[in-house]
Amino acid sequence: MNGAARSAEAVRRARRGVLMSEALTGSRAGGPVDLDGGQRLQILDILVTSIAGTYAHLPAKRAAYASDPVQALTLLRRRAADLSDIEFNRAVSAIVTGLRDAHTRYIGPSTLRDQVAVLPFLVEQYGPESRPKYLVSKINTDAVDDPEFQPGVELEAWNGAPFARAVENHADLETGGRPDSRRSRALESLTFRALEYGPPPDEHWVIVGYRTKRGRKAEIRLPWRMLTPGKAATAGEPGSRAALKQASDLAAEAVRRAKKLVFATDLWASDHERRPVDEVSDKAEVGEWLDSPMQDTLAARPLSRKVGYLRIWSFDLDDDDAFITELIRLLGLLPQTGLIIDLRANPGGLIWAAERALQLFTDATIQPTRFSMIATPLTRQMADSPFNRLELEAWSQSLQDAVSTGELYAQPLPLTDPSWCNDQGRMYPGPSVAVVDANTYSSGDLFAAGWVDHSIGPLVSVGQATGAGGANVWTSAQLRDALSGTDHQPGRMPAGTGFTIAFRRAIRSAAGDGIPIEDLGIPGIPYEMTKDDLMKSNKDLLAFCSSLLGEANE
């Protein structure tokens, strides 16, 4: 077998994955990890210290949800030894997920690291929020042998429950500060779940009730499978200069990659290599996609001779300079009289990339989002530590002042240098409209906030607002490093467990100065998806956005 054939076979195996029922009971997932009593208490103690001392949204979450995660974790210590491993990890995960913050998640034992549980179809919603309809928009035909279960069929039941009720029930287990954002995430996680950041499905298979295109009721049984989608060559790397400047829903990013593996396999297979720009074509006919060496994060095509379309899939990248350079190149190849920028389901990533991109579409001077830490003895010691001088010293004085002033937070300061946000200037001369939804999160929220606060153009929102992720997220390993040498240095999380945490709280700037993003999001012009949007490549949505561009040109 030649190299190309081996590569093709490897891609097929990656897309096929393994049955979850086999992986969780066999040796594929690395076998079970038993946490002894001491390890369980160590996990709880580290989480209590970290959340109480560094979690940026703790006062707001306590007020919003009338619950106290610190007390809940403390009480869990009393019964931790009586629980099974599955019960213990689910209990910890439920407490942390109860914060409704996708930045702050418990990571269970490392046996399921990088794994995503998938069903072989994608379900999407259309119509008004009060009376939604659900249909299958994409199918992995290699994993479905029912010819009547095809894109376009309406979904009516999930394991015997009415489908809308199943979505609502699952939304109760999801992150999201608003009911609509929890429903959006539930709809996604019904068929795609990042197992590193949450428990696996209870069932090994699901029974999906649907109505065929002929109107007949039918059912199909589909097993859960597990994939390892990996990361693109352009993705962010731990330990890089950008590692502490992330704002991302890591679970949603893993799911995005898994969807790409299943439904855009050729693109997934090609994004593991870095290609120089001089090997990339710079031509595309109307309706065709432009070639790009950063196709995991960017995609662009001319919709007509007057309107271009830019898809920003994610800000998960390591090099913001390369991102901005490629973005400028793509903008120059699109029609210059109108642009639609689509950030739906963008899970975030590098803060620098999102905030620097705004300048390309406006003559305004961009003021970046500002971030602050919660004022506690722990964060004061972190900011005063010589180890953290470059990263945290700017907040040190206001953290010290908070002792006497009673302020809950340090002074908010930008993570992106304001000069970087204005070093290129406007590169796209025409009017632009941006599109977001309830799964646009984190750095996607920051882009949307900057878009609105600098009056760059209309913001169209599918759903009430963006996903409302307002923080800079750190991992447990990064937090442990930053606490090194202080009185609060934690031990290492045992058995490959860990967590992510919202460390610095985001505050809007410019016209939205002082408004938090967490749990609120960025609202825009409301839009309800149609069946034609789901089945005909966003036909009505693009027409709606084009009409807004036409108004801007008048």
Question: Residue locations for each model-derived region?
Answer:
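Mature extracellular/periplasmic domains of secretome proteins
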Residues: 329-332, 420-423, 449-450
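Structural flexibility/helix-modulation signal
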Residues: 396-410, 414-419, 440, 494-496
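Short, conserved helix/loop micro-motifs enriched in His/Cys and acidic residues
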Residues: 419-435
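Extended C-terminal subregions enriched in glycine
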Residues: 431-471
